[in-house]
Amino acid sequence: MAIKDVLREELAASVRMQARFAAELAALPRGSLVRRIIKGHAYYYLIYRENGRFQSVYRGKSVLPAELRRYREAKAKRAKVRRSLSQLKKQIRYLKGALRGNEEI
């Protein structure tokens, strides 16, 4: 009985962490800034997905370095959080499978 209790506690903690990661992803700015060279001139666009399709919003010929850094950091953080979220989902699936059995442990 004690092992199942520990597994239930771990499952509850994992579900809470999953919600926290989802909120963290939602707080990040969506998309990424892309520099396109068109006829020898550089233009910046914000690229993101909406309803499964890529959307491109013109941001100007130049973008502030702080904005470039913000989107670069957000992209790195988004990748890190998504990796963690993927591992957490696998852990939750495993814990639910371990708790599914009817026999006493």
Give the ranges of each region predicted by the language model.
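Conserved glycine(s) in the ABC-transporter nucleotide-binding domain "signature"
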Residues: 1-105
